[in-house]
Design a protein with these regions (language model features):
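Beta-strand-dominated extracellular/periplasmic modules and repeats
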Residues: 1-201
Length: 201
């Protein structure tokens, strides 16, 4: 450990801005994090895609966090649904009943992620969407975006955020319908087709 004399603030070097961390790996993995929907719920959808860097390469070590309202547009106010072993504290899984609206998914070796959640209802004047937060190497700060689902063109056209974007940029926020309740949403961190990211306050 390096000791630094902090009695003279002008002699203290700032922490390098290119260093992110410290990371506590044991706290990040969230087994079953993509299983957000209660088991057997009729409004369950699957949202899946890839996370790509600026060169178009898939990122095998990114984290995607999702949260969203229930099908009636209500933001869940329930406690977490994770079950832990009372003796060891180990992860047992979600309880399969409560819908918290939140999940954390790690991308696989091909940069792929997927989540089973409930189709979100509309919040106010917004078209239905899921919020997403991306953590990945090379990012000093995590990125926020939205995942809108296609199908209700009138709601998408009236959405205040989407209405401010040109068609090409708008398309980076709308998932592709793959049929049978499955949607694809690729996240591009930079470059051509870069996903629109939002400032969250």
């Amino acid at each position: 450990m390096t000791k630094i004399d902090t009695s003279r603030p002008e002699s203290v070097l700032p922490t390098p801005s290119h260093t992110v961390g410290p990371f506590y790996g044991y706290a990040l993995p969230f087994p079953g994090g993509g299983d957000i929907a209660p088991v057997g719920h009729p409004d369950t959808i699957t949202v899946q895609g890839h996370v790509h860097d600026g060169g178009g390469n898939p990122l095998p070590d990114a984290l995607v966090e999702l949260w969203g309202p229930d099908p009636d547009g209500r933001v869940p106010q329930v406690d977490g649904s994770i079950r832990r072993d009372p003796a060891t504290g180990g992860y047992l899984g979600r309880n399969g009943v409560e819908f918290t609206g939140w999940g954390r998914i790690q991308t696989d070796a091909n940069g792929h992620w997927y989540a089973r959640t409930l189709r979100p209802g509309a919040l106010g004047r917004n078209a239905p969407y899921l919020s997403a937060c991306v953590f990945a190497r090379g990012l000093l700060v995590h990125l926020f975006t939205r995942i809108y689902l296609p199908g209700d063109e009138a709601a998408l056209a009236a959405d205040p955020l989407l209405a401010r974007l040109d068609e090409e940029r708008r398309g980076t926020l709308i998932a592709a319908d793959q049929g049978r309740g499955t949607y694809r949403f690729d996240i591009r961190l930079q470059g051509e087709g870069e996903t629109v990211f939002l400032e969250f306050q």
